[in-house]
Amino acid sequence: MLQNPELHYLDNAATTMVAPEVADVIDKAMREHWANPSSLYGPGARSEEALNTARAAVARTLGCKSRELYFTSCGSESNNLALLGAVRTRTFGKGIVVSGFEHPSVQRPLEELAKQGYDVTVVKPRPDGTLDMDRMLEHVDKNTILVACMMVNNEVGTRNDVERLAAEVKRRNSRTIVHVDAVQAWMRVPIKLDNIDTLSVSGHKIHAPKGIGALYLSDRLVQAFRPPYLGGEQERGLRPGTENLPYAMGLAAAATRLAKTMKSRDTAMRALNQRLREGLKAFPEVEINSPENAVPEVLNFSENCIKSETMLAWLAEAQIYVSSASACGRGQPSHTLATMGKDPLAIDTAIRVSFCGDNTPEDVDAFLDRFEDGMKHLQRIRK
């Protein structure tokens, strides 16, 4: 996909490049499906048909009904829509339980709900970055209206067993809503929606463009669901505003494309991850932050010597692009590493490498070579 062989893009947890075939679908849709899907005349009817086809394609990759799939602008909007709308369907309590390493688009709405009188309990992860499920379940009782947990952490790649969590939550209180942020999980790990009520995904993490996402909203909730904003009747009245049909079609194309290669990509990602881990063993200062159960697409480590921004600039000079934390927390220390109990030096020197199916062993080797030079050169300057 890369046109420049000298460029090594290893920040795919932040965003992915739009696949050429996805861009082609969008370009064609912009030329052929320009009419408003809500219009009653011929071109509008054809746009509506294309929208329904795209919805069905995305729904198939999630294993849900088409009517349970709502297009949004991004994963962050999906999270906000799910959380702020779902709590308004429950009047029997005020309890909310959430994991301590959520994306800001989950953290901030829940902080706002806490100001409104909801009892929000944040459960820290274990020191290795894994979900402390027992502690989360301890807080679920008859007054718990919502439990939220991301499926794959965006900073360290932790894979959380949200299916088991959802089942245990429902066993304790069948009326508790379970929300899952699956933005980093979709098309990386299998998703089973049993006992999950709402789930968010995003296009730009799977080689679709920025500006398109989706929300799964279970039939169990839809009748009582009260969206936080109002307007037109698009998306069955839950998400007002004329639908972005070309991007919805692009999202469907991207999801369909990746659904065919999940197993082979997983094997390739594991090989790249292991190659990087082996290479990092040459540096005694390096501490791996990603837990053993992390998805292979993400490897987070601290080199405990050079500040992240300095090392990132050094790597970028050679067109090697990685990150230090979540792109959504630009300029901020890693929230996830802090909740894991990492010390300030580890947080200040953390680097996240994240792969996609277009990456190669040469990308890893280029990173390791430049990283080694940086460790030598930058430490000399510091001294």
Residue ranges and their predicted role:
Residues 1-383:
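Pyridoxal 5′-phosphate
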